[in-house]
Swiss-Prot record:
It comes from the Bacteria. One of its GO terms (biological process) is bacteriocin immunity. The lineage of its organism: Bacteria, Pseudomonadati, Pseudomonadota, Gammaproteobacteria, Enterobacterales. Residues 51-141 form the YebF/Cmi domain. It comes from Escherichia coli. Pfam families: YebF. Keywords: Bacteriocin immunity, Disulfide bond, Plasmid. The keyword Disulfide bond applies. This protein is able to protect a cell, which harbors the plasmid ColBM-Cl139 encoding colicin M, against colicin M. This is Colicin-M immunity protein. Disulfide bonds join 55-131.
Length: 141
């Protein structure tokens, strides 16, 4: 027969076990969350991005097409160049793309020179095509 003392003792022990089990689960949960956070951060910072082709894998025609598309998109925002050339869609004349003869696989950037001509003028540009990153920087005369 269960006495009042036995009943209280059983409830107290149950609650103590429950509380310590809860504390144990909190510790496990915190460790689990911490480990997941570390894994997520590592994935974000160290996961290799999808990169474009290396420059030695890009043909001259592909480089010119990429630079031309990028240039024509940017021309819409380059008011000074539009005024100088007299058009947003100039005629483009390509120069020779110089490639490295010694360290072909280490080449990170292709220099793509071209001339843009419009009804009001012409301008020489040098597109620096960063192949793997997939963007172009420009310089002009």
């Amino acid at each position: 027969m269960l006495t009042l003392y036995g009943y209280i003792r059983n409830v107290f022990l149950y609650r103590m076990n429950d509380r310590s089990c809860g504390d144990f689960m909190k510790v496990i949960s915190m460790k689990f969350i911490f480990i997941l956070t570390i894994i997520a951060l590592a994935a974000v910072f160290f996961w290799s991005e999808d990169k474009g082709p290396a420059c030695y894998q890009v043909s001259d025609e592909q480089a010119r097409t990429f630079v031309k598309n990028d240039y024509l998109q940017r021309m819409k925002r380059w008011d000074n160049d539009v005024q100088l050339l007299g058009t947003e869609i100039p005629k483009i004349t390509w120069e020779k793309i110089e490639r490295s003869l010694t360290d072909v696989e280490d080449e990170k950037t292709l220099l793509v020179p071209f001339k843009a001509e419009g009804p009001d003028g012409k301008r020489m540009y040098y597109g620096m095509y960063h192949c793997e990153e997939g963007y172009v920087e420009y310089a002009n005369d």
